[in-house]
From Swiss-Prot:
Designated name of the protein: Serine hydrolase-like protein
EC number assigned by the record: 3.1.-.-
Residue span, AB hydrolase-1 domain: 33-145
Keyword Hydrolase (UniProt): yes
Gene Ontology MF term list: hydrolase activity
Sequence similarity: Belongs to the AB hydrolase superfamily.
UniProt-listed Gene3D superfamilies: alpha/beta hydrolase
Organism annotation: Homo sapiens
Length: 203
């Protein structure tokens, strides 16, 4: 951990995602109720460095860097930074942390993302705390869309990723051996065709 680490910081985390990793910082008690802290747009997890030491330390606080922010990996080129993508990031992070229920502390844009997550996965959120967050209102059809289609899309992607077998990595020697074996077996299955046995088709 760096010498200028935030007061009370107990660990810095790196959580694997398909495009790299999500960076996060943790404070408080590992046995305490979990709280996920979400920073504002173009900010990072360090925006909570001075606030969290002032909060009750019998909670477990994790402040994450959204993708493309702070120490987290940027998205792949050409992938846009949509609000719904950040909602999906939260679902990935809490799955990696093995949290079934937790509270959200969101600042500004982070509060909007946290609110959208709460609307999409209401059974997972214990409390939603918003700091300087713009008011956002959802029509009933938008709410239904979040609870059905967008939620289903997030869960489907995560299920597909979880069911995939890990990629196999071969050494150069293994690759050459596999190629040699394939060429040998294909050569043995070749049949010699007598010359003159093939004639052009007449029109």
């Amino acid at each position: 951990m760096a010498e200028n680490a935030a007061p009370g910081l107990i660990s810095e985390l790196k959580l694997a995602v398909p495009w790299g990793h999500i960076a996060a910082k943790a404070w408080g008690s590992l046995q305490g109720p979990p709280v996920l802290c979400l920073h504002g747009w173009l900010d990072n997890a360090s925006s909570f460095d001075r606030l969290i030491p002032l909060l009750p330390q019998d909670f477990y606080y994790v402040a994450m860097d959204f993708g493309g922010h702070g120490l987290s990996s940027h998205y792949s080129p050409g992938v846009p930074y949509y609000l719904q993508t950040f909602v999906s990031e939260i679902r990935r992070v809490v799955a990696a942390l093995k949290w079934n229920r937790f509270s959200i502390l969101g600042h500004s844009f982070g509060g909007v993302v946290g609110g959208m997550f709460f609307c999409t996965f209401p059974e997972m959120v214990d409390k939603l705390i918003l700091l300087d967050t713009p008011l956002f209102l959802l029509e009933s059809d938008e709410m239904e869309n979040l609870l059905t289609y967008k939620r289903r899309a997030i869960e489907h992607v995560l299920q597909v990723e979880a069911s995939q077998e890990p990629s196999h990595v071969f050494s150069l020697k293994q690759l050459l051996q596999r190629q040699r074996t394939a060429l040998t077996s294909s050569a043995g299955s070749c049949v010699r065709i007598p010359s003159g046995s093939c004639r052009p088709m007449s029109c």
